[in-house]
Design a protein with these regions (language model features):
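Conserved beta-strand position repeated once per blade in WD40 beta-propeller domains
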Residues: 63-65, 134-136, 230-232, 287-289, ...
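Short glycine/proline-rich, acidic loop/turn segments that cap or connect secondary-structure elements
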Residues: 402-406
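Positively charged n-region of N-terminal signal peptides that target proteins for export
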Residues: 1-7
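Beta-rich carbohydrate-recognition and catalytic domains
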Residues: 33-60, 68-130, 139-227, 234-287, ...
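Bacterial N-terminal signal peptides
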Residues: 9-26
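Sec/Tat signal peptide C-region and signal peptidase I cleavage site
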Residues: 28-31
Length: 447
């Protein structure tokens, strides 16, 4: 059942340039040439809110990501739905079902987190427990529905140690999955003297969610494993979806292909795909994120050694991938975690973590969280625009989301991961199991 309404804590206002201002940037191209880039910086301020805090040693919140539900009567104040999960302390990638939080007043008050049965674990057999992890929700305007996409995994019920959990690696261990939310069905009566009623809210949410479905892909060996975890995707003007899918054959490296899907408000149907992107490096390419900016499509990709980037005219067929770099030719230093996009009408932004920020003590350098403007022509990060979005408090913040909320504001959502191996040190540095909303407040409207 639901928790009480959460009142927001305003944590910090921060706009923090990391380097001296430069007149122009220099981008290193694939041919190792340098090209002068005249980038017009887009102004913004940042305010960080704490929407939830839980600092205990059994589990912590992870993967918070938001979706906007437009408000026709008041466009500047849409409803926002946020999905998130629990991770069991000390267990790698053992997550709960998907919880949901909601706000109808621009984040001043949040209802939830609620766990609806349609989004919870399910028992597949006597041997396996099914669930969906790494969820990203998004609005589909043509049908008035929210799509939530993630990865179906299977947990071993017959493990040797009943106190530890592990993912099963047989029978197609990872498959892309999605659920559908209908905001028109999600309504409840507010009890007298209360802003929200947990019981009636939970029942309304049960009506509104259509549970997890497996995303049907072509029956080819290279799609034996497939995933849309922690992935940004694009809705085209005609309602078709462009979804970057990570996939591999049994035991193979992961590749990424952007696929096109039809969505009728209830089911997604495969409609085609573009070229396959590969890298001969450990694990391959995973956790891809796609965005459209000024008529062109940009794709960022995770790899254990470095992040990669590429672009496309049609959103399906992409050019050769290249490592992320600063505009002075130096490596960006992002690896072993995801990157995501924000777009303003005048500028494209990358949100990421990286090495070299006095953060060697943080697991996989997953704090602080940075934001910087991207040169879309040269596919590099303008170093002079890099700012700290959420400071380093000692705990990793690598599993995050990035979403446009209104024409004046975009949000980056993330939780502090409080693992036992570094919990004491992280607490000394200020970590407290918080779930943050970093508000990127644009200096001019994003139209």
């Amino acid at each position: 059942m639901g928790h009480l309404v959460i009142r927001i804590l305003h944590l910090v206002v921060l706009v923090m340039p990391m380097t001296a201002t430069l007149v122009v940037g220099i981008c290193a191209t694939a041919a190792a040439q340098q090209v002068v880039s005249k980038l017009d910086p887009v102004g913004f301020e940042v305010k960080v809110d704490v929407v939830w805090q839980r600092d205990k040693e059994d589990w912590c919140w992870i993967h918070p990501r938001a979706a906007v539900i437009p408000n026709a009567d008041e466009p500047s104040n849409p409803k926002v739905l946020m999905t998130l999960g629990r991770e069991v302390m000390g267990e790698s990638d053992f997550f709960s079902g998907t919880y949901v939080m909601q706000t109808a007043d621009h984040g001043k008050l949040w209802a939830g987190p609620d766990l609806f049965p349609q989004l919870d674990w399910w028992k597949e057999s006597d041997e396996a427990l099914g669930g969906v992890i790494d969820v990203t929700p998004g609005w589909h305007p043509q049908t008035g529905k929210v799509l939530a996409m993630g990865i179906r995994v299977r947990y071993d019920l017959n493990r040797e140690n009943p106190d530890r959990f592990s993912q099963l690696q047989d029978k197609r261990p990872r498959l892309a999955a999605y659920a559908v939310y209908d905001p028109k069905s999600d309504h409840w009566k507010k009890p007298r003297g209360s802003s929200y009623g947990a019981a009636s809210r939970w029942l309304a949410g049960c009506r509104a969610w259509r549970g997890w479905q497996i995303l049907e892909l072509p029956e080819e060996e290279k799609y034996f494993r497939n995933a849309v975890g922690s992935t940004q995707w694009v809705v085209k003007p005609d309602g078709d979806l462009l979804v970057p899918v990570a996939h591999s054959k049994p035991g193979g490296l992961w590749s990424v292909t952007v696929m096109q899907f039809k969505f009728d408000g209830e089911e997604m149907r495969y409609a085609g795909h573009g070229n396959e992107l590969r890298v001969p490096a450990p694990r391959g390419l995973i956790e891809p994120s796609l965005i459209e900016f000024q008529g062109r499509y940009y794709l960022t990709l995770r790899n254990p050694v470095t992040g990669y980037v590429t672009s496309s005219d049609d959103g399906l067929h992409f050019g050769p991938i290249k490592p992320w770099k600063f505009d002075d030719g130096a490596e960006l230093g992002n690896s072993k975690t995801q990157q995501h996009w924000l777009a303003h009408a005048r500028g494209l932004f990358l949100v990421y973590t990286r090495r070299g920020a006095n953060n060697d003590h943080v697991v996989r350098h997953r704090a602080p969280l940075f934001i910087a403007q991207v040169d879309p022509a040269q596919l590099c990060v303008a170093r002079r625009t890099e700012r700290i979005l959420i400071p380093n408090h000692g705990a990793p913040m690598g599993n995050f989301g990035a979403t446009q909320i209104t024409e004046n504001e975009s949000w980056v959502t993330v939780s502090e991961l409080m693992w036992p191996t570094y919990l004491a040190k992280a607490r000394k540095q200020g970590a407290a199991g918080r779930t943050f909303v970093a508000r990127v407040m644009w200096a001019e409207p994003n139209r």
